[in-house]
From Swiss-Prot:
<comment type="function">
    <text>Involved in the retention of proteins to the late-Golgi. Plays an integral role in the complex vacuolar protein sorting process.</text>
</comment>
<dbReference type="GO" id="GO:0005770">
    <property type="term" value="C:late endosome"/>
</dbReference>
<feature type="repeat" description="WD 2">
    <location>
        <begin position="137"/>
        <end position="176"/>
    </location>
</feature>
<keyword id="KW-0813">Transport</keyword>
<comment type="similarity">
    <text>Belongs to the VPS8 family.</text>
</comment>
<dbReference type="InterPro" id="IPR036322">
    <property type="entry name" value="WD40_repeat_dom_sf"/>
</dbReference>
<dbReference type="GO" id="GO:0005794">
    <property type="term" value="C:Golgi apparatus"/>
</dbReference>
<protein>
    <recommendedName>
        <fullName>Vacuolar protein sorting-associated protein 8</fullName>
    </recommendedName>
</protein>
<dbReference type="GO" id="GO:0008270">
    <property type="term" value="F:zinc ion binding"/>
</dbReference>
<dbReference type="Pfam" id="PF12816">
    <property type="entry name" value="TPR_Vps8"/>
</dbReference>
<dbReference type="InterPro" id="IPR025941">
    <property type="entry name" value="Vps8_central_dom"/>
</dbReference>
<dbReference type="InterPro" id="IPR056938">
    <property type="entry name" value="Vps8_C"/>
</dbReference>
<keyword id="KW-0333">Golgi apparatus</keyword>
<feature type="repeat" description="WD 3">
    <location>
        <begin position="183"/>
        <end position="223"/>
    </location>
</feature>
<dbReference type="InterPro" id="IPR045111">
    <property type="entry name" value="Vps41/Vps8"/>
</dbReference>
<keyword id="KW-0853">WD repeat</keyword>
<dbReference type="InterPro" id="IPR015943">
    <property type="entry name" value="WD40/YVTN_repeat-like_dom_sf"/>
</dbReference>
């Protein structure tokens, strides 16, 4: 189990710090893991245990508290008042048509035109009977009501467009005046007062007309001014399209310290929502248009404003919610210097259409009325539904005139099928008017909801809902949530739940038999708890989850105090203690009471879980610790981490853990054990933390003064020359008794701690103030002198000492001053200790660091020691720095011999090693005379370096040693095995001039002969193309002919302008290649050879033209015939193979060969077109060959036809051709060869002649093959 309080990233040892504990501790992936998280809690409770942080939404189908938000009933008082009204009206029926509520004042309008006035504070009831005069009363239904914020003014609107204004503060109420701003055929749907003011009233009717009424000095002169709201100049929406429902219009006014600041009207339609200011003039300040589509419902609501003051830059913030169809949008509204800005905060889409929005007074809860009369309570911060309710009576008030008015403005009745004043909401109640009476729903307090849930459904839903409410206090109105009572109720539920779970866990009794056999209490509890966690994981997770939630509510100590006696009485207290152990270890519960600390520690002690105890105590807040008990307990049990925690965090006394640490070192020397070794490792963590200004074990920073005091005190104790009055058994007869404890067995860890601590600012100071005294610091110089003084008297010295001194002296060279003998001793120690392979690199780095401050050392002795201990890196450093280049190259070679070893520096990078040798030439130029010696040494080992990586060696030699390259070549010539190999590498990197200046022709020819013999024609051709001047070497052609390098010969002859020889070798190359080809096989090698053949075929015609520039026609004819018939033999051989039809590679070559022959014919004809003897010779030779060789007959006939067609040879010359073909075949083939005309006329000797001996007709041969006679 890993500690939950977090270890520092500084590690004393490289080993894994994780401990494997017994099965009693929570380990691996068991269900009772000590890293128990919120997901495990949710497995049992069904809700995130971090609900106070995540505000997880409740799903309606998952929880059963939805019907516990409101308690519904009938408003009997209004029903009795209606009966009384009916009695006074001589049995005329009357129903409630509208309702309004403000504070304790409830008014209900009736269908008879009366208003029922109820003051719940005084329990008074009155009937307001409006009249136009003393003798004329109004009997039209009351369709809208409004109560001012002061509860002094009541306004009632009627179906005839009349508004009556009452002063209800009078006894009896006084009708102030009547307003007739609306037309007589209109129905008033809204009466809205301006926020907190009694001065301005807004009224609307079902025709979409809006009127503003301003009241002045109502008490004195009862003056009222009314005017219609004219929006024509503001280019806004058509007022006729305003929806006649409860959310059509609202009138808001925000205040700063009681002074009117901003007033605006919100106008709602099915197309958009607009915000308009009235003063000083009507102005449209914001408009939001709904997305295109059919909108069947739209509504809005404003929250109460929040005032922020900041000097003159006062800003007002409010929240605005609007809904259309099933979409809800939430805005943040800001008013600043007369300007309004809206910012979209969140949006959500519900499954049902929204009809109405209310912002719950003084809270962050939005109440939504859906189209099915369901109410949803929504958290405005996340737009998640946290509860639902259902209206008791869904048959809301419906009037025929209302439906008719909706139809008149083209609005479907499904939009909102009830009138505006049929619903009313207050902080405690919701009133709903139906056709018979008034339903009232009271919002239950959270404590009432919890009580109802626990009675109906049990613990879980009550606990979940109560936890959510307490954890989200900001969204609930204070009127409904009394935190103290809710928490007390939750605590009682938790206690009841946990007590019910106690009977489900096994007690110790089933394991008594096991205990008697083993007589081991630890093993008994281990078996018991392991078995419990396997079989009762769900119940155990429930216990932990309950503890987590209870702790988040601050009631865990009280719950534990009540349940521990219950679990103890039934022998199952181990369940509670293990759960608490898990919570404390995971830092979820950090302040257990002293009694609880005793319980848990004694339980762990009985189970002999010392490591768990040592991890548990630092997880408890030190202010809550029972210091005396914990201190004694930690000392007696040897709990090092706990003792450090108590001493440093509670007492601020570092001497206790230091003394304990020294005793641990003594114990580890005298009688080592695994437990002691673990605590010693913790002790070095303590030392490292303390010397670097941190508190152990939590890793908190000490303040700077305390850190200096701690560091100073620890160093004074550790480096004390004589024993101090501590309870540490040390030898009094030796110096530095405490330092010896560190160096006896744990020198590596001690020096590592000290080296890290040397970076702390304390060591850079000369003086520090301790106990109000200015004292000298314990500086680095003095510490090193103390350690060196101790080691001078010891025979064996730890290598970590030498490494430590090397690092420190190099890092703080400006602050340390030691003698040369001191440095020499350190250097001798580093060079002469036996170093394992895995530590050699560390020692080499330490020596290099030491040599940065110590320069006057014995070079020869040091190098000899390094050679003895194979410290090749040090040899490289010293030898190069001191100009001992022979040692340097020898060390390079020795490093290469180490390649492949486990801890080899070189590994497999030979290129890096060679590059290192040559890169030194860039820096060595700064030292006069050193370059010559270094180059000389390098050249002397040329063969060895060449063997490491010959390619890299040659490349770097040409780059850095070009001026001395003759010496390199001379050295390579002395080694026969690499002479030609060296030349084979450099020939690709140098010019021909360099090659000829460094090598004789005989050597070059020998190299070329070797290349042609070993690597063949292709490699030889590559060299000749790289260095074309090689073709002039005497004897080159003999070498090429000897090794049958035909392609190279072709290249040489072309370079020497011997075109006839080049052409003959091309023919030879083609014949040779075709003789070795397997025409039945097509692979990559064959494809590449065919490509090369095609390239050579393309050179035949240019070479032929070069050969026949100044040659007689007869010689051209003979040469042409010899060349063409050589190529024809190749073509015939390809034609004999039927497989070529399926081999694309050979088919391409055949086409290329045919094209070459035709191009040769074109070239020949261009030179001998006027020489008839040559033409006849070619013609006869082709005919003879065609007659003699049946395999070439078809191709030669086509060639002959091409010859005849291209030359337009007449009948006298073509008569020999008729020996080969019949007439029709001749003309058909010939017609296919002509490309520039539709046909040709041919004289036929078999046709009759006229009297004058002339032919009377000719044959017309078309290229399509059709033959026609044409009369002349």
């Amino acid at each position: 189990m890993q500690s939950k309080y977090g270890r520092s990233s500084l590690k004393i040892k490289n080993g894994d710090d994780t401990r494997t504990l017994r099965a009693l501790s929570f380990s691996k992936d068991s269900v009772n893991s000590s890293s128990f998280d919120n997901e495990a809690a949710s497995t049992t409770l069904g809700i995130s245990t971090a609900i106070h942080a995540s505000n997880r939404p409740f799903r309606q189908d998952e929880y059963s508290w939805n019907d516990c938000w409101m308690r519904w009933g009938q408003l009997r008082r209004v029903s009795s008042q209606l009966r009384e009204l009916r009695f006074t009206m001589n049995d005329q029926p009357a129903t409630v048509t509208s309702i309004a509520y403000q504070g304790t004042l409830l008014v209900a309008g009736t269908s008879s035109g009366h208003v029922l006035l109820n003051d719940w504070r005084t329990n008074d009831f009155q009937i307001l009977k409006p009249g136009l005069s003393s003798n004329e009363s109004v009997t039209l239904p009351v369709t809208s009501l409004a109560i001012s914020n002061s509860k002094r003014i009541v306004c009632q609107g009627h179906a005839g467009g009349i508004i009556f204004v009452w002063d209800v503060s009078r006894k009896p109420p006084l009708q102030l005046f009547t307003i007739n701003q609306h037309s007589e055929d209109s129905v008033l749907t809204h009466l809205v007062f301006n926020g907190n003011s009694d001065d301005v009233l807004l009224s609307t009717d079902h025709l979409g007309k809006i009127a503003v009424h301003e009241f002045y000095n109502l008490v004195i002169n009862k003056h009222c001014t009314s005017w219609n709201l004219d929006m024509s100049k503001s280019n806004s929406l058509n007022l006729d399209s305003i929806i006649v429902d409860t959310s059509s219009i609202s009138f808001e006014e925000l205040h700063i310290t009681g002074v009117k600041h901003f007033s605006f009207v919100v106008l709602q339609s099915l197309q958009s929502i607009q915000i308009v200011t009235l003063f000083p003039k009507t102005t449209l300040i914001y408009e939001f248009k709904y997305p295109a589509g059919i909108v069947s419902s739209a509504c809005h609501s404003f929250s109460s404003s929040i005032v922020h003051k900041n000097g003159e830059n006062t800003k007002l913030h409010a929240f605005f919610a609007t809904a259309y169809n099933n979409n809800l949008r939430l805005y943040s509204v800001t008013f600043h210097k007369g300007y309004m800005s809206l910012q979209l905060m969140d949006r959500k889409k519900f499954a049902k259409a929204i009809w109405k929005l209310w912002w719950f007074p003084s809270s962050s809860i939005i109440i939504i009325l859906f189209d099915d009369m369901e109410l949803a309570f929504v958290n405005s911060m996340s737009l998640d539904i946290i509860g639902t309710s259902t209206i008791l009576d869904k048959s809301l008030l419906r009037w025929d005139w209302y439906s008719n008015s909706l139809a008149a403005i083209g609005v479907s009745q499904t939009v909102f099928p009830f009138i505006s004043s049929s619903l009313c909401i207050s902080p405690r109640y919701m009133f709903v008017v139906n056709s018979e009476t008034v339903s009232v729903g009271s919002f239950l307090m959270v404590s009432e909801q919890l009580q109802m849930l626990s009675e109906r459904y049990g613990f879980f839903d009550s606990i979940k809902f109560g936890s959510y409410c307490v954890s989200n206090l900001s969204i609930f109105p204070k009127l409904l949530l009394e935190k103290t009572s809710v928490i007390n109720l939750i605590m009682a539920l938790y206690v009841k739940l946990l007590k019910s779970l106690a009977r489900d866990f096994p007690a110790r009794s089933p394991f008594e038999a096991t205990s008697q056999k083993t007589n081991d209490y630890e093993l008994e509890v281990q078996h018991l708890f392991t078995w419990t966690c396997e079989l009762y994981s769900e119940n155990f997770n429930t216990v932990i989850s309950s503890f987590i939630i209870a702790n988040s509510l601050g009631i865990l100590p009280e719950i534990i105090e009540q349940i521990i006696p219950v679990f103890t009485r039934v022998g199952k207290v181990y369940v509670v203690l293990e759960a608490l152990f898990d919570l404390i270890l995971s830092q979820r519960f950090t302040n257990p009471s002293p009694q609880l600390q005793h319980h848990i520690l004694n339980y762990l002690n009985d189970c002999k879980r010392l490591q768990d105890m040592d991890k548990l105590i630092p997880c408890i807040e030190y202010q809550s610790l029972d210091l005396d008990f914990i201190t004694k307990f930690s000392r007696s049990k040897g709990l090092f981490d706990s003792l450090c925690y108590v001493s440093i965090y509670a007492f601020n006394d570092y001497s206790i853990p230091l003394v304990q640490f020294l005793n641990l070192l003594k114990s580890d020397i005298d009688s080592p054990s695994e437990e002691t070794s673990i605590n010693v490792e913790k002790g070095f963590h303590f030392l490292l933390y303390s010397l670097t200004g941190m508190k152990y074990p939590l890793g908190h920073s000490n303040n700077i003064n305390d850190a200096y005091v701690v560091i100073h005190t620890l160093l004074k104790v550790i480096f004390s020359v004589v024993p101090l009055p501590f309870d540490v058994p040390v030898d009094n007869s030796v110096d530095f008794p405490y330092l010896r404890l560190f160096l006896e067995k744990h020198a590596d860890d001690f020096f590592r701690c000290l080296e890290v601590a040397f970076d702390y600012p304390y060591f850079s100071l000369e003086k520090v103030t301790i106990a109000k005294k200015l004292l000298d610091t314990v500086n680095r110089q003095w510490i090193l002198e103390c350690i060196s003084q101790l080691y001078e008297k010891k025979k064996s010295v730890s290598q970590s000492y030498y490494i430590f001194v090397s690092h420190v002296t190099a890092n703080y060279s400006n602050q340390l001053l030691f003698s040369q003998s001191f440095y020499q001793g350190i250097l001798d120690g580093l060079c002469n200790i036996d170093v394992p392979d895995d530590k050699r690199e560390v020692v080499e780095a330490a020596i290099e660091e030491l040599l940065t401050v110590y320069e006057h050392f014995d070079i020869a002795t040091t190098l000899l020691s390094c050679w003895d201990h194979q410290l090749y890196q040090v040899i490289l450093h010293i030898s190069f720095k001191c100009g001992r280049y022979e040692d340097y190259i020898e060390a390079i070679l020795a490093l290469w011999k180490q390649k492949g070893q486990k801890h080899s520096f070189v590994s497999e990078s030979s290129e890096a090693l060679i590059s290192l040798v040559f890169n030194n030439l860039q820096t060595i130029n700064r030292f006069p005379g050193h370059r010559e010696r270094y180059v000389s040494t390098l050249i002397s080992h040329c063969g060895d370096l060449f063997a490491i990586n010959h390619v890299c060696f040659v490349r770097n030699s040409l780059k850095y040693l070009l001026d001395d390259f003759t010496k390199v070549i001379t050295k390579t010539f002395s080694i026969k095995s690499i002479r030609l190999q060296f030349l084979s590498l450099i020939i690709y990197e140098i010019t021909y001039e360099q090659l000829s200046s460094w090598y004789r022709e005989r050597t070059i020819l020998s190299f070329l002969e070797l290349v042609s013999f070993d690597q063949g024609d292709v490699k030889m051709l590559e060299l000749l193309r790289l260095h074309p001047k090689l073709v002039r070497l005497q004897g080159l052609m003999e070498i090429l002919n000897k090794n049958d390098c035909i392609e190279s010969c072709i290249f040489v002859y072309r370079e020497l302008a011997e075109y006839k020889l080049a052409l003959s070798h091309v023919s030879k190359y083609i014949e040779k290649s075709m003789s070795v080809f397997d025409l039945e096989k097509s692979d990559d090698m064959t494809s590449r050879r065919i490509e090369r053949l095609c390239l050579h075929l393309k050179t035949v015609v240019p070479l032929f033209e070069q050969c026949t520039k100044e040659v007689s026609a007869e010689d051209v004819t003979n040469f042409w015939l010899e060349l063409v018939f050589t190529l024809l033999l190749v073509y015939i051989k390809l034609s004999l193979k039927g497989s070529i039809n399926s081999q694309i590679t050979f088919k391409d070559f055949q086409q290329e060969l045919s094209l070459c022959i035709e191009n040769l014919l074109d070239s020949f004809l261009s030179k001998t077109n006027s020489y008839k003897i040559a033409l006849n010779t070619v013609l006869v030779r082709i005919c003879e060959e065609a007659s003699r060789n049946e395999h070439s007959d078809q191709y030669l006939r086509k060639l002959l036809l091409k010859l005849i067609t291209d030359l337009y040879i007449n009948h006298d010359i073509t008569k020999e051709c008729f020996l080969l073909w019949d007439m029709k075949q001749f003309y058909e083939i010939r017609s296919t060869l002509l490309q520039n005309a539709s046909g040709v006329l041919v004289e036929d000797p078999k046709l009759q002649k006229n009297a004058k001996g002339q032919y009377t007709s000719k044959l017309k041969v078309y290229f399509s093959g059709l033959i026609e006679r044409e009369d002349l």
